[in-house]
Regions:
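Mixed-charge interfacial surface used for oligomerization/domain docking
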Residues: 3, 10-27, 32-33, 86-89, ...
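Conserved beta-strand elements of the Class I
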Residues: 4-6, 78
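Class I S-adenosyl-L-methionine
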Residues: 33-102
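A glycine-rich beta-strand to alpha-helix segment
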Residues: 81, 110-111
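A short helix->loop->beta-strand "cap" motif at the edges of active sites that frequently abuts
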Residues: 105-108
Length: 242
């Protein structure tokens, strides 16, 4: 039996050694260019170009065909997506599941809405691999990963909200003021949507706030994954704080 793990690229995980795994591209777009989020993307160049871009930007989720291509010929597929409250990726994957199972009777696709992004998705992908390696059956894997998800939490910090302004999520004037005064936004996503919880000045206060919010959310030891965008120093400081 062939079993496969699939996710969209918001997991920031393009390969997974020891697992049959495929990442499906999300797309970041402006009026002049598209960036396909895969292992070939020059992230530094994209960040630089977006930092000086004045127009609107946005994202596009994988289409049904992209998901079907990723499912390939697997007998069982275990899939997770960015929060369905933030993107159409989850609904697209569900549509692909229905089509795949209808076209291939007997095959199964489990689609899990992470209700988060990035590190949370990585934790779920790792859990899928662990249970597949333990030769658990399909229903057990689905049930145990769903339960595992309930014990995860994502906390984020934004140094800049420029891109949120460019895609219309916040006012440009608000973004300019936040950047001018070095205000960092710290938040979580308890219901799958971005939920700002704190506004602080400077990186040091942001890191302290992240850890405080971890404890408030019930963290008392355990695995933590830290993603960052060209901020290794802050990631290491947070690691040492934890």
């Amino acid at each position: 039996m062939k079993r496969k793990i699939v996710s969209d690229s918001s997991a920031n995980m393009y390969n997974f050694e020891g697992a049959d795994y495929t990442s499906v591209d999300m797309i970041i777009s402006t009026d002049t260019k598209e960036y396909h989020d895969n292992e070939n993307l020059d992230v530094a160049q994209m960040v630089e170009e977006l930092s000086v871009y004045k127009g609107r930007s946005g994202t596009a989720c994988p289409g049904v065909g992209d998901w079907l291509e990723a499912f390939a010929d697997a007998d069982e597929v275990f899939c997770t997506t960015i929060s369905g409250e933030l993107s159409g990726s989850y609904n697209s994957a569900l549509a692909a599941k229905e089509q795949y199972e209808e076209t291939h009777p007997g095959r199964k696709v489990y689609v899990l809405d992470s209700r988060a992004t990035g590190p949370t998705m990585k934790l779920l992908i790792e859990k899928f691999k662990e249970l597949i390696s333990a030769d658990k059956d399909y229903d057990t894997i689905c049930r145990e990963v769903e339960d595992y998800k309930k014990h995860t939490c994502i906390i984020f910090s934004l140094e800049s909200v420029r891109n949120l302004a460019n895609n219309g999520r916040i006012n440009h004037a608000v973004a300019a003021i936040a950047n001018m005064f070095g205000i960092r936004i710290v938040g979580n996503a308890p219901e799958g949507t971005l939920n700002p919880t704190d506004k602080v000045r400077g990186e040091k206060k942001a890191i302290t706030c992240i850890y405080k919010n971890m404890k408030k959310s019930g963290y008392h030891g355990g695995r933590v994954l830290i993603d960052h965008c060209f901020n290794e120093g802050a990631a290491q400081t947070l690691k040492q704080t934890i």
